């Protein structure tokens, strides 16, 4: 949600992060989040992919509702160019929980180095509603884990 996507940026963006673009996407996202908040939701979980690194965020988009959080995990792709981007849109008060990637694409010069950054995400919801999400590398190691309990309304 906060990671600008679309390349080159002169072609526009295909995500909600507005950065230097004034688009309707951000307003649309805020409408969706307001609706979820009004329905009583407190923990939303978003899955995004194809950003060429992995990252996890927790958002607290409404100052008057600190219990309302949105979580996002972005992963992958599993075997592609690595283009880490540490910039993100601060509009929804994001807190970065994890970043899995090199400092810069130029830091990766060999196949062995590249393999350490390839990743995918997993998501499991057990019978009691506990959500377990993870960023996993090609060795099967969990580089980041997040567990969310279902809310009681």
Listing of model-derived features with the role each one plays in the protein:
Residues 1-153:
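Long, structured stretches of catalytic cores involved in phosphate-ester chemistry, encompassing
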